[in-house]
Amino acid sequence: MRESAAQYLRPGEPIQAVIGAQTASQWLAALTGFFVFLGLNRYRILAVTPTRIVVLDAGKTSMKTARGLVTELPRSTRLGPGTGMWHQVPAGSETLRVHRRFFKDLDAADSSVVAA
């Protein structure tokens, strides 16, 4: 994710954290089926830099490769602390759901805001 996100950053802009997220609730897959979930869900990559948070589209099937810019958030935006199995993060007009495996990255991103 880090390598594919780098092409959407400014030259020399370092990445502090990379976080995977999705737009649809995980309950949608359980209640309607996997194929409906794939039709409605989009994966996102949050690339956190010292000056901004870049939200990138990663497509419908994987969060591995960034495919385009969705929005930018101010660096002062708090992403965590993560709670539960899936933590919700408001990102522009979307609510992104971040799985607990990325909670350490949420904490790292938020701690670098405090340090700055």
Q: What is the role of each PLM region?
A:
Residues W86-S111:
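Canonical phosphoinositide-binding patch of PH/PH-like domains
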Residues M1-R44:
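Anionic N-terminal interaction surfaces
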Residues A115-A116:
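Short intrinsically disordered terminal tails
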Residues W27-G84, P90, T95:
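Phosphoinositide-binding peripheral membrane targeting modules
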Residues E13-P14, V18-G20, A58-T61, W86-V89, ...:
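Aromatic-residue detector
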